[in-house]
Every structure is written in structure tokens, then in C-alpha cells.
């Protein structure tokens, strides 16, 4: 995955897709004030922990281009949220869509406190996946649920 700023790559992340052999590589030259960012010119920013969760939310969202997206790639690299708010004054709301675990809950607490102090005009919304720990697992759950229903559907 490559994220660009002013037509230059500023954040590169490699990620494996085989669950039994977890692989992820980030590069030392990555700009963690930018992270992996997709700008659709929206006033609403969706923040995720992982790029795959970002893509899952895009798939689950009816019109994914209504939002900007930021994957911080770790609960420790949340500074990028504030950098994007500082550099893009049209953003009016932040939708926190991180993992539903202790680290994700703590991240939301930290970010909300800091956002309220530094950007009091920005609305904050926190939502966790209704089922499963993260948004990619939730997408898989929804697809499997639909396929199970489709498998029992009889077409006349």
C-alpha cells in the first residue's frame, strides 16, 4: 500500500494476506504524520487502525467517496489525525472506527480528550464493529452470513 502527498510517496506498507503467516512491513522513511490517507474532499474523516479495516469499511459503506479515510496503522501513531485536521480545515467530524479491544478503547479515550481540547469545533463519533473485533472480521462475518442465506435461497 502506498500513500501519496503532493504526488510523492510518503507512506508505504506491505501486508501479507495469509492468516497463518502474518506479515507486515513498514519503511523507516514513512511519514507518520501523514500515514495512509485517502482524500475525497470530504468534511468527514474516518480513522481506522489498519488499512485492511479501512478497505472493509469502504466496502460496507454505501457511498464510500463521501468520506476521507486515515489508517494510522497502529494505536501508537495517532498523531496523524491531528496533523490532517490542522492541514485540512474543512474537516468537521471524525469517525473513530478502531478495533474493539483494550488498545482501541484506550486510543479512543486519548484521541477524544485531545480532539476536544485542540479542535473543539470537530464532532467525534465512536463506533465499534457490531460483531467481531475489527472491521475486516465484521465484513467477513457479513459476507459469510449472506452466503449462508443465499445457499438456502430457492429461485423459482
What role is predicted for each listed range?
Residues 1-87:
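Phosphate-handling DNA/RNA-contact segment within nucleic-acid enzymes
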Residues 42-43, 59-156:
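TOPRIM fold recognition
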Amino acid at each position: 500500500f502506498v500513500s501519496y502527498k503532493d504526488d510523492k510517496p510518503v507512506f508505504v506498507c506491505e501486508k501479507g494476506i495469509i492468516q497463518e503467516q502474518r506479515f507486515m512491513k513498514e519503511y523507516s522513511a514513512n511519514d507518520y504524520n501523514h500515514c495512509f490517507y485517502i482524500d475525497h474532499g470530504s468534511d468527514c474523516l474516518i480513522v481506522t487502525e489498519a488499512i485492511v479495516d479501512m478497505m472493509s469499511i469502504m466496502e460496507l459503506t454505501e457511498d464510500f467517496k463521501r468520506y476521507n479515510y486515515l489508517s494510522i496503522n497502529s494505536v501508537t501513531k495517532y498523531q496523524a489525525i491531528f496533523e490532517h485536521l490542522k492541514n485540512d480545515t474543512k474537516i468537521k467530524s471524525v469517525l473513530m472506527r478502531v478495533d474493539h479491544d483494550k488498545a482501541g478503547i484506550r486510543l479512543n479515550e486519548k484521541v477524544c480528550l485531545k480532539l476536544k481540547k485542540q479542535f473543539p469545533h470537530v464532532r467525534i463519533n465512536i463506533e465499534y464493529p457490531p460483531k467481531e473485533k475489527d472491521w475486516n472480521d465484521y465484513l467477513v462475518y457479513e459476507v459469510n452470513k449472506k452466503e449462508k442465506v443465499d445457499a438456502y435461497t430457492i429461485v423459482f
